[in-house]
């Protein structure tokens, strides 16, 4: 698995330490092991997890600004845990409403000794942002409209941002953004060995 990860990182032009590579592989091992009992992801093959979960998460890292982030609807920790591994100087709150997912996140935190994550079981609209976050991240969580509606209290103003990971660019969602936000930028992402388009939509709270 290490060779596969090395090849993917090289193809993406991402440089991380051996320790970070080992942590990413440990995380995939744990996800694969827990997935058999808890059904945390539809991806069953660890090699595919490297592409569709690890690489698909960490290609976002250069585009994040700030130090405090919240990953809403994180599921088994995506993209929050891979981002926390490759960005150790930032802190990531990992929010999910399902207990089994949060139990997994806490086990990952313990086994990988990740001091820069905080797993939280809560519905996003009930979670207090005190203080507000530099970035609100979502991946496969909701439409842009719902994300803004549920998470509007979370980002700092005016500097905070919403970061939504999307596949094909959702033109219809972008044309019907709710009041209170505006489009900051759209970044086309390149994920080695992943078919289909990937985009990062960055929204700015007004």
UniProtKB/Swiss-Prot annotation:
| Catalyzed reactions | guanosine(527) in 16S rRNA + S-adenosyl-L-methionine = N(7)-methylguanosine(527) in 16S rRNA + S-adenosyl-L-homocysteine
- Entry's localization field: Cytoplasm
* Keywords recorded for this protein, A-Z: Cytoplasm, Methyltransferase, rRNA processing, S-adenosyl-L-methionine, Transferase
Short name of any one Pfam family annotated for the protein: GidB
What one GO molecular function would you report for this record?
Answer: rRNA (guanine-N7-)-methyltransferase activity
Q: Which domain of life is it from?
A: Bacteria
The record's section on Gene3D superfamilies has:
Vaccinia Virus protein VP39
Instruction: Cite the HAMAP family for this sequence.
Output: 16SrRNA_methyltr_G
Q: Into which family does the record put it?
A: Belongs to the methyltransferase superfamily. RNA methyltransferase RsmG family.
The protein in question is named Ribosomal RNA small subunit methyltransferase G
Task: Specify the species.
Answer: Pectobacterium carotovorum subsp. carotovorum (strain PC1)
Corresponding gene?
A: rsmG
């Amino acid at each position: 698995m290490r060779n596969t990860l090395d090849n993917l990182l090289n193809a993406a032009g991402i440089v991380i330490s051996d320790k970070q590579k080992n942590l990413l592989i440990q995380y995939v091992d744990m996800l694969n092991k827990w997935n058999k009992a808890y059904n945390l992801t539809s991806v069953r093959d660890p090699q595919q997890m490297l592409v569709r979960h690890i690489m698909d998460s960490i290609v976002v890292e250069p585009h994040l600004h700030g130090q405090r982030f919240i990953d809403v609807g994180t599921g088994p920790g995506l993209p929050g845990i891979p981002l926390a591994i490759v960005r150790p100087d930032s802190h990531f709150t990992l929010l999910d409403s399902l207990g089994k997912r949060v139990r997994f996140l806490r086990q990952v935190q313990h086994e990988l000794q990740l001091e820069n994550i905080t797993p939280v079981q809560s519905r996003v609209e009930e979670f207090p942002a005190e203080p507000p976050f530099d970035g609100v991240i979502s991946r496969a969580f909701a439409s842009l409209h719902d994300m803004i509606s549920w998470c509007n209290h979370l980002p700092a103003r005016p500097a905070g941002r919403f970061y939504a990971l999307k596949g094909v660019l959702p033109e219809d969602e972008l044309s019907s953004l709710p009041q209170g936000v505006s489009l900051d930028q759209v970044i086309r992402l390149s994920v080695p060995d992943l078919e289909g388009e990937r985009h990062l939509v960055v929204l700015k709270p007004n």
